[in-house]
Amino acid sequence: MGCAPSIHISERLVAEDAPSPAAPPLSSGGPRLPQGQKTAALPRTRGAGLLESELRDGSGKKVAVADVQFGPMRFHQDQLQVLLVFTKEDNQCNGFCRACEKAGFKCTVTKEAQAVLACFLDKHHDIIIIDHRNPRQLDAEALCRSIRSSKLSENTVIVGVVRRVDREELSVMPFISAGFTRRYVENPNIMACYNELLQLEFGEVRSQLKLRACNSVFTALENSEDAIEITSEDRFIQYANPAFETTMGYQSGELIGKELGEVPINEKKADLLDTINSCIRIGKEWQGIYYAKKKNGDNIQQNVKIIPVIGQGGKIRHYVSIIRVCNGNNKAEKISECVQSDTHTDNQTGKHKDRRKGSLDVKAVASRATEVSSQRRHSSMARIHSMTIEAPITKVINIINAAQESSPMPVTEALDRVLEILRTTELYSPQFGAKDDDPHANDLVGGLMSDGLRRLSGNEYVLSTKNTQMVSSNIITPISLDDVPPRIARAMENEEYWDFDIFELEAATHNRPLIYLGLKMFARFGICEFLHCSESTLRSWLQIIEANYHSSNPYHNSTHSADVLHATAYFLSKERIKETLDPIDEVAALIAATIHDVDHPGRTNSFLCNAGSELAILYNDTAVLESHHAALAFQLTTGDDKCNIFKNMERNDYRTLRQGIIDMVLATEMTKHFEHVNKFVNSINKPLATLEENGETDKNQEVINTMLRTPENRTLIKRMLIKCADVSNPCRPLQYCIEWAARISEEYFSQTDEEKQQGLPVVMPVFDRNTCSIPKSQISFIDYFITDMFDAWDAFVDLPDLMQHLDNNFKYWKGLDEMKLRNLRPPPE
């Protein structure tokens, strides 16, 4: 159907960088069209396959416009078409005509209202500009409603030209209700019209173009065989495709707008729901098997994938759920996806599936696989069947093997490398290659992170045995905190601060600082109240624990234990830790810090294993000292009722506390150092950073607290806490850092001397007292073990003072090393 005879259309090309024919000056009087020209259609010149549009800026310079990008979708914007509806030619009409010419838009002008709809249905204009200044000559609002009545106008931008008025502005709601997109206050200036068109092109028109593209996306959703559901961040259902309705037995009208919680679910899966929510609330996808209830009450097993969608403000605005029913009626692909997904769910929930049900599932899958054996190789299906009964890592390897069969060669080779890594025993511990330029680092790694080489000569190293009982001291043990001598009380005045002087307390207590600092620290945290024990019982316990530290050790003595206890208490007082840990966690941390090196012989695990010591034999060369510290501490505690701080606890509380203490003491073993740090970074730091980027809202804070307070994450936090407390010497003020470096070096020197005397392997050759560079050893220790761990801990707890000390101390050791000095301090000037 053509346009009315009154509509005249002509087309011509605009020469590049050439002035428009008969272009009028940009005067306030407005432009005039050449005599007899009613319309102008000005197509942009475009070569075949051109991916950029061209328009001109105010100076006539060509401007490139990229294709429209809509998510992962890219499409080209055709030359825009503009329909001008003016009852007479005036300056405003001519201004828009010339602006269209300047912008390179096709322009059509019509004067008769009755011809507008027919013309629009023929051309499908992107922009319609209607003269709204003379209602008696042209009822613009009625015309707009008429256009909007056509479904084809859904994505059309309609602009109304209104008069400039001096009186008070009226509401534009009637204007919008009529169907107008926006209004334009009359201004015939060509540049004003041109700028308005550009704003429309890159604003409303571009947005409508994207909305129009959504039709193809919705078409795909509506015709998808997968059931798809979209909900808001508050879990209100916004969309459900026909496959979802068919699967669940609901109609769209029953679901749209309803809260997800109102839809019947299997209440027995509360733990699974918690797992799902904890995953998707931090922006991670979740996939697994989920049992839902249909409208008619039937249970249905689904392979569900839930994808959080980030929207405005970087926050999660929608959740997309893609659902497949695991009914085995169709293809082997669906079978494999269901089984693989079920595997993922097992890992997520951490629960064993019912053995009987599991075997039924295996038989069902095997039966279905027989029907489709021609579609998939038997080897793939055999691997997939085994997933339901194998260990998690085996399931992962099987899934990768199955994926390799249909992957191109580069992907297959990359997956081979992944499998090679997965088959190693230490997934979280980095592999260290020998560094020729850093023998100190090599020796530290070998000496602290291995159990040594077993000596086969038959010679055995026997630790000096002593009775595990209280050792007499030349100082008076206090009856209570109120009975502490004045000098010792003064030495403990600043125990709440990080720069607390532990060496002053050591001197005041004649090398027995643990009992005094322990009494004060435990009182501050209310440990006696939690354990339901008296202060005298706690005092006796601290006495027997301290008595079993070797005062002859330069480093691993009760002063080190008191220092670790102080650091632990300092960390526990930080706000993030107080919000995360429970009282029982605090008690476990303080007790673990107190006992973590009890009866330490002043030798490393590697030394004991190489020497064939009684402890190494007892603990099978695995975490020898750490196992001994924990076991002996509980033997000492429970062996005498007078010092048994656990005697009044409920059995379940005691078991939980004991487990927490042992876990923290074992975490101080350096062979697991990188495993603990990497797990903390991946499970705590990274998810926390993602959540905190979303802003500090009450809802977001609740998600953070829920994530941090899971038992698994609290365990990781406690391990990291005691690890950092145990090796915090490089983060102490410089004078204390130097003293600790002197003590640990002397202990290592003594071990090297004994290894040479007994003909044992020397596990740390650089710690030879005649040749060792203490600055180099400190630099290597900080580089390899301290920096990354404290960066992660600081990101979680916020410890600016410690990080400043660490930086200062590193610079100090670096300066000594650059001066080729091997001692603790520079020579006096």
UniProtKB/Swiss-Prot annotation:
Activity regulation information from UniProt: Inhibited by dipyridimole. Insensitive to selective PDE inhibitors including rolipram and zaprinast as well as to the non-selective inhibitor, IBMX. Unaffected by cGMP.
Pathway: Purine metabolism; 3',5'-cyclic AMP degradation; AMP from 3',5'-cyclic AMP: step 1/1
Record domain PAS: where: 213-283
Record's catalysed reaction(s): 3',5'-cyclic AMP + H2O = AMP + H(+)
Names of the cofactor(s): a divalent metal cation
Coiled coil: none
Record-listed Phosphoserine modification sites: S20, S359, S386, S457
Top-rank EC class of the record's enzyme: hydrolase
UniProt: a divalent metal cation 2 binding residues: D597
Residue ranges constituting the PDEase domain according to the UniProt record: 480-820
UniProt record, GO biological process: cAMP catabolic process; cAMP-mediated signaling; cellular response to epidermal growth factor stimulus; positive regulation of ERK1 and ERK2 cascade; regulation of DNA-templated transcription
Cofactor notes: Binds 2 divalent metal cations per subunit. Site 1 may preferentially bind zinc ions, while site 2 has a preference for magnesium and/or manganese ions.
Annotated EC: 3.1.4.53
Sites of Phosphotyrosine modification: Y461
Segments for region (Involved in RAF1-binding): 454-461
Post-translational modification: Phosphorylated at Ser-359 by PKA under elevated cAMP conditions, this enhances catalytic activity.
Keyword entries, A-Z: cAMP, Hydrolase, Metal-binding, Phosphoprotein
Location of the region described as Disordered in the Swiss-Prot/TrEMBL record: 16-46, 341-360
Family designation: Belongs to the cyclic nucleotide phosphodiesterase family. PDE8 subfamily.
Record function comment: Hydrolyzes the second messenger cAMP, which is a key regulator of many important physiological processes. May be involved in maintaining basal levels of the cyclic nucleotide and/or in the cAMP regulation of germ cell development. Binding to RAF1 reduces RAF1 'Ser-259' inhibitory-phosphorylation and stimulates RAF1-dependent EGF-activated ERK-signaling. Protects against cell death induced by hydrogen peroxide and staurosporine.
Record NCBIfam families: sensory_box (TIGR00229)
Comment on protein domains: Composed of a C-terminal catalytic domain containing two putative divalent metal sites and an N-terminal regulatory domain.
Assembly, per entry: Interacts with RAF1. The interaction promotes RAF1 activity.
Name this polypeptide is given: High affinity cAMP-specific and IBMX-insensitive 3',5'-cyclic phosphodiesterase 8A
Organism: Homo sapiens
Gene encoding the protein: PDE8A
